[in-house]
Amino acid sequence: MKTLNSTPRADGFHMPAEWAPQTQVWMVWPERPDNWRLGGKPAQAAHVTLAKAIARFEPVTVAASAGQYENARRQLDQPNIRVVEISNDDAWVRDTGPTFVINGHGEVRGVDWGFNAWGGFDGGLYAPWNRDEELAAKVLEMERCQRYQTEGFVLEGGSIHVDGEGTVITTEECLLNRNRNPHLSREQIEAVLRDHLAVDTVVWLPDGLYNDETDGHVDNFCCYVRPGEVLLAWTDDSNDPNYARCHAAMDVLKNTRDAKGREFIVHKMPIPGPLYATAEECAGVDQVAGSQERDPSVRLAGSYVNFLIVNGGIIAPSFDDPADAEARAILARIFPDHEVVMIPGRELLLGGGNIHCLTQQQPAPVKR
């Protein structure tokens, strides 16, 4: 693997939209007992369900630690799922894996962002995180992809959504947080995004979903569904703490044009719940200094927006909630050429995220 001294934009590469053709999806096998209850066993079962759902549409590669490799391999024993051994600190490959970029000549490379476990020692979710910091480079090594490294710049893949046509959406709550890149101004952060995603327009939403422990990742709140169109988590309940967040985001989107000069079409997605972990679920998580404490009184940041687009499919979470059926109908309407597959998302949510957070698509090479 070669680490390049240039940037994707300078070399003619860009991050494609999630609906672009993919060669595979990456996942990481969960096991961390201070994040996943009961030693991670319920979460592992949920990951098997997720991997098999994706594998109906395209290949899946699941990275597992040495101690869990055989267990993962046996549980994921089907032809379209590959299991490889990569040491890791947790399963959030959207944030720890590389952001793949492509050009028009059939090449795929990767951006290796800095990672500090969502805040380092200022509100981060666990320590140490050195194995997660190394994961992107190992994935790129495995795929023989050349690497761009943003030395000294922290970013998680869940904090950005692109349309592949020059626009990225993010949140101020995350990217301007003092625990990510406090040494950089908003303008300097935008410059890094422009250079490494090859975008021209950065759309800043004020906040993400209430109580999102990643500091408001956009992939749990607002996502692109096609160029010029987004899906926004929404509530009409003025007593819901998400109400002000949703309306503030809508104000930005309604008064912003994208890189192509288009006004945004905004589709609304209901927010499930409110959802909470039970005392029993919280008691199953090991208590370790420096790790995120699980508390049944704290609302979970459940969201149907946290879905993954794959080749011909939409893999979305369900929560055994009255809004599940409406969420499915909305996704089916927005993606008429995709099959909507909903899988139980509660166990993933208990760990702090959901389907999009736990997956990373690898785009297919494009030759023009």
From Swiss-Prot:
Domain of life: Bacteria
Active-site annotation: C357 (amidino-cysteine intermediate)
Pathway(s) it belongs to: Amine and polyamine biosynthesis; putrescine biosynthesis via agmatine pathway; N-carbamoylputrescine from agmatine: step 1/1
Keyword Hydrolase: yes
Reaction catalysis annotation: agmatine + H2O = N-carbamoylputrescine + NH4(+)
Stored InterPro entries: Agmatine_deiminase, Peptidyl-Arg-deiminase_porph
Subunit structure, interactors included: Homodimer.
Annotated family: Belongs to the agmatine deiminase family.
Name of the protein in its database record: Agmatine deiminase
Organism listed in the record: Pseudomonas putida (strain ATCC 700007 / DSM 6899 / JCM 31910 / BCRC 17059 / LMG 24140 / F1)
